[in-house]
Amino acid sequence: MSETISCRQTLAVTSHRVLASDLNEHETVYGGALLSLLDGTASISASRFARSQCVTAALDQVNFIKPFVLNDSLCIESYVTGHGKRSLEVFVKVIGEHLDTGERFLGMTAFLTFVVLDKQVILPELSAETLEEKSLCADFQKREAYRRQKIAEQKKLQASLSLDFPWQS
């Protein structure tokens, strides 16, 4: 019988203050920098679940909801919401706070897929406790089916792509 781990046991939380060096030309946090931060946090959740080395395989359903600006803080929360034999899904939400007023807001959400490198690892069962966790875990199979469909489409696309450099014709 396999072990059961709760979503809460995979929870990883990181906080960051937005500095001038984080901003793009629109004076909001550069999206690529934010993606790097959330990938790092999500990887902790993946490792807590698998207790093995995992790599990021996909970043899905990235929703930039509200921008982060200078002197905001952002709190990244991630936890596992489903898994297959060697892959697992991590949900990430980024909560912003305007530090001068204390107002909080949902700034971003995303789902990341990680793959366990060690083929011998047997992933534990996952249990959800809160309403949010139960809702996200309940829809895992739908998201997984959609990802599989998109992977098949991506493979067709990749087969048609040229690897020649256009300037060397």
Where are these regions (language model features)?
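Short histidine-centered beta-strand/loop micro-motifs
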Residues: 25-28, 67, 103-104
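HotDog/MaoC-like acyl-thioester-processing domains
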Residues: 8, 12-14, 69-70, 81-169
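A positional/architectural concept
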Residues: 2-60
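Hydrophobic beta-strand-centered segment that forms part of the acyl-chain substrate-binding groove
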Residues: 5-9, 43-82, 86-88, 105-109
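Hydrophobic residues in beta-strands and at strand termini
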Residues: 18-19, 64, 114-116
